[in-house]
Amino acid sequence: MYIIIPAYEPDKRLIQVVQDITIKLPKARIIVVNDGSGPGYNDYYDETAFIGATVLTHPINKGKGAALKTAFAHIQEEVVSQHLSAQPIVTVDSDGQHLIKDIVRVAKAIEENPSHLVLGARAFVGKVPARSRFGNKVTAGLFRLVTGQKVTDTQTGLRGMSTDLIPWLLNLDGNRFEYEFNMLLEAKKSGHQISEVPIETVYLEENKSSHFRPIRDSIRIYSPFLKFSGTAVLASVIDATALFVLFALTKNLLLSVVLARVISASSQCLLNANVVFNPTSSLFRSSVRYFMLVLVLLACNYFLLSSLVAIGLGLVLAKLVTETLLFLVSYKVQHNVVFA
């Protein structure tokens, strides 16, 4: 079994974590990644190396996602060179918030289901920092909207996976905290089932040791959704501009509306393919799926809007409800089908 501990500017708790794992899981191979902490923290890393951990070092801070990728790449080289069979990997935070018994539970879950991505899920009861509780609710809700799958703890750092998943893990986007969320988003699309095992919720000193930056890292985590929203707004601007220009040139409203929609839809398709989703299938195939989706959404828009107005909802409110629902549906379908 491999245990990965990414660390940035740690304290003495890192040493305690490594000591506890070494004592209670003596066969585990511990990999600590120094993510550019600086010379002032070398004593902590030297001590973990003395205890028996392998320490990998980034010259500068690259982010948690990059630290995990560095560890995955190291493990892959070791597995290949030593001709090792599939092994469970468990990622653990450096601040002591993950208990040994929970690390063992996650590892056992991977041994039983090696194709799964296993999450150590906290219950979020008791004294949980407000930002942690709120952040997890937002990301869990967004994840469920996008994938249709319920995950109770999207931000857990205690995760398990098999070494067989390393090639997939190394190809995921993101180098900071968004990497872990991207891992969840891409798991279902790639055919890797997500499962959870309950773990004890532990927060030390109100989670002050966390290097999560609420604004900057939240933007990174939600960037796929924000990019999708941005392309939708830009497409609307293109649609309106094209409509006015075409109508001024042709004086034909129907032709102008149709051509403007074709131009804006084509623009959004290209933007979503190259900026938001990065599909594995060909652009032609994705484009065909996209325009089929556009036609379906257009029909749904009409029927849903007319139905809401028919039951007495005002046109403005009905339009708002319709566009919001179809926006979420569109994102989910494009993520899971159109640009898969």
What are the roles of these predicted feature ranges?
Residues 45-88:
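Conserved donor nucleotide-binding strand/loop of the catalytic core
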Residues 39-40, 85-86, 92-109:
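Acidic donor-binding/catalytic loop of UDP-sugar-dependent glycosyltransferases
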Residues 9-23, 40:
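Short, well-formed alpha-helical segments that are part of the catalytic scaffolds
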Residues 9, 35-37, 62, 71:
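Conserved short acidic donor-positioning loop in nucleotide-sugar-dependent glycosyltransferases
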Residues 34-44, 60, 96:
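A conserved acidic beta->alpha catalytic loop
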Residues 11, 172-248, 265, 269-296, ...:
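Hydrophobic helical membrane-anchoring modules
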Residues 54, 60, 66-74, 100-177, ...:
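Acceptor/aglycone-binding surface of glycosyltransferases and processive sugar-polymer synthases
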Residues 1-2, 29, 182:
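Cell-envelope/extracellular polymer assembly enzymes that use nucleotide-activated donors
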